[in-house]
Each structure stands twice: as C-alpha cells, then as structure tokens.
Amino acid sequence: MIRVLESLGRDFTIVFITGRWAMGQAKVDAFIDNLLPNIKKIVFCKPHDYPGTTAEYKLAQIKELESDGYKFYMGLDDHSAVIGLLHNHGMFVAKVISD
C-alpha cells in the first residue's frame, strides 16, 4: 500500500467513507490520521440517523464529491474479495468498480 501511495506522488487525496462506527466521527478521524499521517485525506463516517444502508451512504458521498470535482479511480472495501485496507467496514475510495 505504501508503494502505491508513493507512486501517486503528493497530488491526491484519500477519501475514506465508513459505515456507522460506535466511536463517532472524531475518533474515526483520529484513528485514520494516526494510520496515515502527512497524507491529505477526507473522512466520512455514516451518521447514526442516516436513513439508508451503508452502501447507499457511500454511493451518495461519492456522487457528491464527484459533483464537487473529485475524480475517483479505485474503490477498496474490507468485505471485497479483492483487498481490504481497514477492518470494521472501512473503505478507501477512488472509483466504485461496480454498482
């Protein structure tokens, strides 16, 4: 993972979109900052009062970010058959590979 990040250079932002974490947004932010210091990142933690599923929340956040000009290239989820970067429903988002 570190090699992938190093090959990207410094002109990128990692977006984490997570499900409901009992610890709350502030602790999720601190947890991810501790994992990846000195790397630009945005963290979205699904609020407890969000009416939809975690998948719906993640897709809604991606659509909103894309409308703000972000470009997503790859999406990885811990429940994916491919790879997991965070436990407990964490997701590193850069492009949703499939609907």
Where are these regions (language model features)?
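Substrate-recognition "cap/lid" segment bordering the active-site pocket of phosphatases
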Residues: 22-71
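Conserved beta-strand termini and adjacent loop/short-helix elements that scaffold enzyme active sites
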Residues: 17, 45-46, 96-99
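Surface-exposed amphipathic alpha-helices with a cationic face
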Residues: 5-9, 63-66, 87
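Acidic, Mg2+-coordinating phosphoryl-transfer loop and its flanking beta/alpha structural elements
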Residues: 62, 70-99
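Short, acidic loop-to-helix structural element flanking the phosphoryl-transfer center
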Residues: 1-15, 22-26, 56-59
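Acidic carboxylate-rich catalytic motifs and surrounding loops in phosphoryl-/glycosyl-chemistry enzymes
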Residues: 18-21, 47-48, 78-81
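A structural micro-motif
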Residues: 12, 41, 91-92
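Short, surface-exposed connector motifs at secondary-structure boundaries
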Residues: 9-16, 66-72
